[in-house]
């Protein structure tokens, strides 16, 4: 039986949206306000439609790089964490200002891996999410890059968004990328690459389609998105990869249009 997106989306309530550094910042690390405003407007519209919206946002380190006038993303952990500490405030202030223009309230939650795997801490995190959503607050999530160390870090926000989706019992996870979705091969170097619209199951062939690193200011590539898809779909949550630069792409998603790559949930 052919999968019907529109039919599934009728019962969707909780939507987690992850947006990456490549969408939020320019190559020099400064914030791309055009893309951020476009993103916020779409999220507000989803919220107005009655959805609970949870945003997992990258961009803190990138914003810090821009503010500190660095020429590239820092290599050492202390410098990365310093950039994150500076950038997180800039990023959240920007979000707060734009969301407030539409009368929306946001709440910041900075997580670590321990918040996902420790039973008590994950329960506390879930309770916090539920309290915010009950009050129609839009949570904005990032990993606590300013203090986390390699041993306890999630490492990328694709994976973080999948864990968050489990915590909030999301009905759909949307990863906004700088590419239309998963292709049969890398479309940047192969003109014959075809967009894969629907993935029933993550097989070795699907995994082989994902390769390459992310941008210099980010940590994720298609491989981390496949990892996120495994986590989400195994928890019964479908995941969608879409191009964050596409005009009104989130509206296309909730209206059931055939955009991006849909990873079906494991029943």
UniProtKB/Swiss-Prot annotation:
ATP binds at residues 18, 177-178, 219-225. Disulfide bonds: none annotated. GO terms for biological process: L-proline biosynthetic process. GO terms for cellular component: cytosol. Its EC number is 2.7.2.11. PROSITE patterns: GLUTAMATE_5_KINASE. Coiled coil: none annotated. Substrate binds at residues 58, 145, 157. Keywords: Amino-acid biosynthesis, ATP-binding, Cytoplasm, Kinase, Nucleotide-binding, Proline biosynthesis, Transferase. The keyword Transferase applies. It holds the Pfam family AA_kinase. It catalyses: L-glutamate + ATP = L-glutamyl 5-phosphate + ADP. Pathway: Amino-acid biosynthesis; L-proline biosynthesis; L-glutamate 5-semialdehyde from L-glutamate: step 1/2. One of its GO terms (molecular function) is glutamate 5-kinase activity. CDD domains: AAK_G5K_ProB (cd04242). It is an enzyme of class 2 (transferase). It is found in: Cytoplasm. Belongs to the glutamate 5-kinase family. This is Glutamate 5-kinase.
């Amino acid at each position: 039986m052919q999968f019907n997106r529109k039919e599934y989306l009728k019962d969707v309530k909780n939507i987690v949206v992850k947006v990456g550094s490549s969408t939020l910042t320019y190559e020099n690390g400064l914030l791309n306000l055009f893309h951020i405003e476009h993103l916020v407007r779409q999220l507000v519209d989803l919220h107005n439609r009655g959805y609970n919206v949870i945003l997992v946002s990258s961009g803190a380190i990138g914003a810090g790089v821009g503010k500190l006038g660095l020429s590239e993303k820092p290599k050492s952990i202390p410098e990365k964490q310093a950039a994150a500490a500076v950038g997180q405030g800039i990023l959240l202030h920007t979000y707060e200002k734009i969301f407030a223009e539409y009368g929306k309230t946001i709440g910041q939650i900075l997580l670590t891996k321990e918040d996902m795997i420790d039973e008590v801490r994950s329960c506390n995190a879930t309770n916090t999410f539920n309290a915010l959503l009950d009050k129609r607050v839009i949570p904005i999530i990032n990993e606590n890059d300013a203090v986390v160390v390699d041993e306890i870090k999630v490492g990328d926000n694709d994976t973080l968004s999948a864990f968050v989706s489990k915590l909030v019992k999301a009905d759909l996870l949307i990863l906004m990328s700088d590419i239309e979705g998963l292709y049969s091969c890398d479309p940047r170097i192969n003109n014959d690459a075809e967009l894969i619209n629907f993935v029933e199951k993550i097989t070795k062939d699907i995994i082989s389609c994902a390769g390459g690193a992310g941008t210099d200011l980010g940590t994720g590539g298609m491989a981390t998105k496949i990892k996120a898809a495994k986590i989400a779909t195994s928890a019964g949550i479908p995941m969608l990869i879409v191009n964050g630069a596409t005009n009104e792409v989130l509206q296309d998603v909730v209206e059931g249009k055939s955009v991006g790559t849909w990873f079906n949930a494991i029943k």
